């Protein structure tokens, strides 16, 4: 039973996490361009800011997870907040922003700014849940007898996620704001549901102990190397 639960958690969280990353990596630049007429400079700024957010989050939250000796809470609640942050993109539309902020002269410019900020927030939760803690949970939950198999399954998920996303979004018109709203509601809802399931399905790895107070800075320095 525990073995089946482990593989179920691995496949579910790895696949859903990679689906969310594919949407972020492949579609956000298209979204900000079509919906808010973003310039190449603004698109580059969004990519750079989210990359910095992902790197710093993985380093510092990963070390914090080691320090506290906790994986489940970071993963489950991280996926829940990750889903909520994706859902927020469903409400980023030029017409809605213009109606909500009538005093703003350029709703598209405000929209670009909000997309960049929300992307960093989404990346923070995604990197917390998936990059920093889920991958650590996978290592903690395996040993020499099954780690290679588990890592192999985890490694193939980015490719499978690309097929899922591109195959599942063939209906979408990237110039239609309503289609973006539907897409973000679906992806955000699935990630949110995944996090809720994690509260029940994920088990803390055996032998994972809370570390001494001085270990946090040492872990951060180690991860930076």
Each language-model region and where it sits:
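C-terminal ends and interior cores of transmembrane alpha-helices
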Residues: 77-109
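Central cavity-lining transmembrane alpha-helices of secondary-active solute carriers
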Residues: 43-65, 84-85
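Helix-loop boundary and gating motifs at the non-cytosolic
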Residues: 1-54
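Juxtamembrane intracellular "pre-TM" segments in multi-pass secondary transporters
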Residues: 1-4, 206-225
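Helix-loop junctions on the cytosolic side of multi-pass membrane transporters
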Residues: 94-97, 199-213
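Symmetry-related core transmembrane helices of the 12-TM Major Facilitator Superfamily/SLC fold
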Residues: 181-200
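Glycine-rich segments within core transmembrane alpha-helices of 12-TM secondary carriers
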Residues: 53-55, 148-173
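Intracellular juxtamembrane helix-capping segments at the cytosolic ends
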Residues: 28, 127-142
């Amino acid at each position: 039973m525990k073995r089946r639960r482990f593989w179920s958690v691995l496949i579910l969280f790895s696949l859903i996490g990679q689906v969310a990353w594919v949407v972020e990596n492949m579609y956000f630049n298209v979204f900000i361009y079509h919906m808010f007429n973003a310039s190449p400079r603004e698109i580059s700024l969004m990519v750079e800011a989210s990359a910095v957010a992902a790197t710093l989050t993985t380093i510092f939250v990963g070390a914090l997870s080691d320090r506290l000796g906790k994986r489940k809470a970071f993963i489950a609640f991280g996926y829940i907040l990750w889903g909520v942050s994706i859902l927020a993109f469903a409400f980023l539309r030029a017409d809605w922003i213009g109606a909500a902020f009538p005093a703003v002269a350029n709703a598209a410019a405000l929209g670009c700014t909000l997309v960049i900020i929300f992307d960093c927030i989404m990346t923070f939760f995604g990197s917390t849940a998936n990059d920093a803690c889920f991958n650590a949970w996978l290592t903690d939950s395996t040993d020499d007898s099954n780690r290679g198999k588990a890592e192999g399954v985890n490694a193939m998920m980015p490719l499978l996620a690309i097929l899922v996303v591109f195959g599942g979004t063939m209906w979408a018109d990237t110039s239609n704001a309503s289609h973006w709203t539907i897409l973000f509601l679906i992806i955000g809802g699935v990630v949110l549901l995944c996090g809720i399931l994690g509260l029940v399905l994920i088990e803390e790895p055996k032998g994972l102990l809370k570390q001494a107070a001085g270990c946090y800075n040492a872990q951060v320095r180690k991860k930076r190397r």
